[in-house]
Amino acid sequence: MKGDAKVIEFLNAALRSELTAISQYWVHFRLQEDWGLAKMAKKSREESIEEMGHADKIIARILFLEGHPNLQKLDPLRIGEGPRETLECDLAGEHDALKLYREARDYCAEVGDIVSKNIFESLITDEEGHVDFLETQISLYDRLGPQGFALLNAAPMDAAE
């Protein structure tokens, strides 16, 4: 089914955002793991994998609309140099994604592409959950301080390899 060209553009922009998030969350997972923040690292890894699912849905929709998914472009990665900064970087990426997805959802509704609109609605719901989680973690970091936050996110000694 031939899709609206601008809808396909929005889907490719969303794909770029998701591919960027996959890489960024994965690098943060590895950094956090290296810093001994096993619980924080586990969550970043889960987020990266969730973003892979988003990318897969977007690719399938682009192909259904007879478009060409562009997996060669990424937005610049924002890589934090410490625990709080990784959270801030991820939060900035989520805010950027939400802005794009809301604009895309509205355009899809205007042109009557309800399936693409629903995909963007689903992405918005997931990204809002990510924003809430990240804002909560930043607040915890600020209230507990670096040491308290590290203790909260460290794995128990008996879980060490």
Curated annotation (Swiss-Prot):
Cellular component per GO, a single term: cytosol
Catalyzed reactions: 4 Fe(2+) + O2 + 4 H(+) = 4 Fe(3+) + 2 H2O; Fe(2+)(in) = Fe(2+)(out)
EC class of the enzyme, as a word: oxidoreductase
Chain positions recorded as Fe cation 1 binding sites: 18, 51, 54, 127
Keyword set, alphabetical order: Heme, Iron, Iron storage, Metal-binding, Oxidoreductase
Single annotated GO MF: ferroxidase activity
Sequence positions that bind Fe cation 2: 51, 94, 127, 130
Binding residues annotated for heme b, in chain numbering: 52
Free-text cofactor note: Binds 1 heme b (iron(II)-protoporphyrin IX) group per dimer.
Cofactor: heme b
Residues annotated as domain Ferritin-like diiron: 1-145
E.C. number: 1.16.3.1
Annotated TM spans: none
Pfam families attached to this UniProt entry: Ferritin (PF00210)
Top-rank taxon, per record: Bacteria
Database matches in InterPro entries: Bacterioferritin (IPR002024), Ferritin-like (IPR012347), Ferritin-like_diiron (IPR009040), Ferritin-like_SF (IPR009078), Ferritin_DPS_dom (IPR008331)
A single GO BP: iron ion transport
Oligomeric form and interacting partners: Homooligomer of 24 subunits, arranged as 12 dimers, that are packed together to form an approximately spherical molecule with a central cavity, in which large amounts of iron can be deposited.
Family the entry assigns: Belongs to the bacterioferritin family.
Role summary: Iron-storage protein, whose ferroxidase center binds Fe(2+), oxidizes it using dioxygen to Fe(3+), and participates in the subsequent Fe(3+) oxide mineral core formation within the central cavity of the BFR protein shell.
PANTHER family: BACTERIOFERRITIN
Protein known as: Bacterioferritin
Species per Swiss-Prot/TrEMBL record: Rhodobacter capsulatus (Rhodopseudomonas capsulata)
Gene: bfr
